[in-house]
Amino acid sequence: MTETASGPARSSRAKGTKAGKGLRVERVHTTPGVHPYDEVAWERRDVVMTNWRDGSVNFEQRGVEFPEFWSVNAVNIVTSKYFRGAVGTPQREVSLKQLIDRIVKTYRKAGEDNKYFASPADAEIFEHELAYALLHQIFSFNSPVWFNVGTPQPQQVSACFILSVDDSMESILDWYKEEGMIFKGGSGAGLNLSRIRSSKELLSSGGNASGPVSFMRGADASAGTIKSGGATRRAAKMVILDVDHPDIEDFIQTKVKEEEKIRALRDAGFDMDLGGDDITSVQYQNANNSVRVNDTFMKAVQDGGKFGLTSRMTGEVIEEVDAKALFRKMAEAAWACADPGIQYDDTINAWHTCPESGRINGSNPCSEYMHLDNTSCNLASLNLMKFLKDDGKGNQSFDAERFSKVVELVITAMDISICFADFPTQKIGENTRAFRQLGIGYANLGALLMATGHAYDSDGGRALAGAITSLMTGTSYRRSAELAAIVGPYDGYARNAKPHLRVMKQHSDENAKAVRMDDLDTPIWAAATEAWQDVLRLGEKNGFRNSQASVIAPTGTIGLAMSCDTTGLEPDLALVKFKKLVGGGSMQIVNGTVPQALRRLGYQEEQIEAIVAHIAENGNVIDAPGLKPEHYEVFDCAMGERSISAMGHVRMMAAIQPWISGALSKTVNLPESATVEDVEEVYFEAWKMGVKALAIYRDNCKVGQPLSAKTKTVKDTEKAEITEKTEAAIRETVEKVVEYRPVRKRLPKGRPGITTSFTVGGAEGYMTANSYPDDGLGEVFLKMSKQGSTLAGMMDAFSIAVSVGLQYGVPLETYVSKFTNMRFEPAGMTDDPDVRMAQSIVDYIFRRLALDFLPFETRSALGIHSAEERQRHLETGSYEPSDDELDVEGLAQSAPRAQELVAVATPKAEAEAAKPAPQQAHTSAELVEMQLGIQADAPLCFSCGTKMQRAGSCYICEGCGSTSGCS
């Protein structure tokens, strides 16, 4: 992309005066005399985004201008998230051209002002190449660049911040303030609390110190308040404590205790879902927690030895603990509630380029940026699929040369941004300008591996990922050394020259040891080797412009803006996804990477069509016609019957960590059946493999996660019998495919019923629920207040409406799901031991009806349990009765009644098969849930109500692009 005209190195304090000729910029994608915008076809589109749950319009802007090849989803996200100016005013951006120009022209001007370019012509080529890469979704800056650059507001370009706190009240209060200002700007922050005295140490006044866990409470409340004060996403926040801190056990247990509190409150009837009205009363819910462990501790765990907890004031050991027992407590806590994560201190600092300026103590909330305290990092991610050359016949290669040139372009732009960037605090601004940390990374790794026929958990897949990562970071540091020759090394380089060069040698040595696997990765390794040789040579001569170059971020919103199939280093979520259509609507499609992989593996077009059709029908490759079993692993995804194992994720992290300056944002997902020992294995093996940090998430471990939709059976044999009987009944009943109209099934004159008296918040009432003699609930009568009153009349009308609906076949569970959790007065305590708290009379009524008439699995999925079941859960960990307690006959009788239908004359047709009525999914995450019968671990989007999906250690909304992280 660029060539360097050499000149003597000089300090970056010289305010941009050039010592050499600057960068000579080479055209790679663009044509002389033709602007990149003129090479593509543009069209006008309407962006109307709704909350599909209630139909309300969240965002609307019509007539926006985008290239024809941009997907509907990418257009929606960029328009709603990144266009600036009030909608409906002349100041509002209406075209992608305006957005890209706002950014690239700012970067060009700053580059010219700071003497980066050899000539105005080179500056123009830089602008055009940068515009082309953004226009064609080859890479993306992190969200703050899109939000702020070129606008009147502060030019904040960094998404990741690390703060610090000392053992003084002034410093602690400054922490609260600085963190709040960063949250206000939509970014995230992390810090290490280990300098704060433990609760086991004395104050100068003679009393005991509060300890860091106590001060975490105030910071957590602050983060929650700022979120509720108008932000569309949760504040991203990380707190870390060293494993040798005397309060480490309290820190480990903070979220476990709160999770137990959440469960108790939920069982009492409070709304404890993520984002629920009552969850705000629970502490420590706004941060990720991580324990920083060192090699001494991990070796003590390995050997079964003791480990010393040290005073913050004197450094002396004040308590010895069993290392293995403490490690077990960490694993138990993570198993129970997904926190704490783990960071490996000695591994992190062994790769530290600036140890003379301080240790690496903290990280950003997603754990990919790790450097000095009070610093920041601006991120950018490359779309790896844009560099795959595929002739459509199975012949593939990775364009390493073009990839390297784009990396050079992006690193240059990222470094220029530090020249004009604003920062939330003076300390962060000074340190970031002095050390100039960058975080280039990539997205779509999972898609690239599948497209090239590599299993995610395979030696070939890891080799390809490692080669690309090594080339990216090697090229980045080479460009950094070239920039140092023109505009000088970073201010802290002189003090840290020796350790910085040592780390470069470590990267280079790891590159030399890497195993080459096939025709795809071998040329990339060769290019990476050349890059690292240049790094060592130029770095020795010029120094480096940047103290850090690369991280792997979650790439949440920006990944969707680039139309990436996968985020960060994640594997594909599933083989079938949703594609939004221009003009509205959507369709299910099999990933385009699937046929690419099949061609690479040598399958013929007829075979590929059959396999793709099987995937479209079943959502997986199992028993796909003509697909060899040894190729199944290529199509393994994050979820499903053939999901990638936890250690498969860890091995991929270990394969690319040696060539990343920072770390990797990654959560290792475990199935609900995983044990504490499995968590211990992941944490221990990751340390042995050289990973810097990770977190785990065991499915269904948190109350805030939607309940699993997969029902549990009584016994496997009974399941088989029930299935056979059901299929026989269906075959007997469904003989023709006809058009139906529902009819009302009235109750007989004499009908069994239950009358229940109740009080809700002091208001008394009676409910009579009458049933069909053998087939479920048929009508409901409610008696409240005196006859003739408004409330009594409304209850009568409501009862009639519900009863008529039941008699026309509306399932009771539909009413229950709609009317539970409605909030209005009267509300509060009830006299019913099974429903201790009700948010309204309607909430109580339908919880009571669910308990009386719905089968266990149905109401359990809705979070409704009797007092006996809640007690059983406390004792055994399960709401479900044991096998000898089950009344199978009773369950069958209480099953929901099939709707009676009358046929209207239509042509006769034979029934091919009886399938459940299709549910309506709105995102790929929800489609996966339908196919797999389980619900993905994810909250609902605060903006549009869509189910979010994981992106690294964060969540991303596929519908509107909102993210819980910082990219």
UniProtKB/Swiss-Prot annotation:
Q: In the Enzyme Commission scheme, what number(s) does this protein have? A: 1.17.4.1
One biological process term from GO is: DNA biosynthetic process
Q: Where does the source fall among the domains of life?
A: Bacteria
Q: Where is this region: Disordered?
A: 1-23
> What reaction does this catalyse?
a 2'-deoxyribonucleoside 5'-diphosphate + [thioredoxin]-disulfide + H2O = a ribonucleoside 5'-diphosphate + [thioredoxin]-dithiol
Gene3D superfamilies in the cross-refs: 3.20.70.20
**What residues sit in the active site?**
N364, C366, E368
Q: Which SUPFAM superfamilies match?
A: PFL-like glycyl radical enzymes
> Per its database record, what is this protein's job?
Catalyzes the reduction of ribonucleotides to deoxyribonucleotides. May function to provide a pool of deoxyribonucleotide precursors for DNA repair during oxygen limitation and/or for immediate growth after restoration of oxygen.
The protein in question is named: Vitamin B12-dependent ribonucleotide reductase
**What species was this sequence derived from?**
Streptomyces coelicolor (strain ATCC BAA-471 / A3(2) / M145)
Q: What is the lineage of its organism?
A: Bacteria, Bacillati, Actinomycetota, Actinomycetes, Kitasatosporales
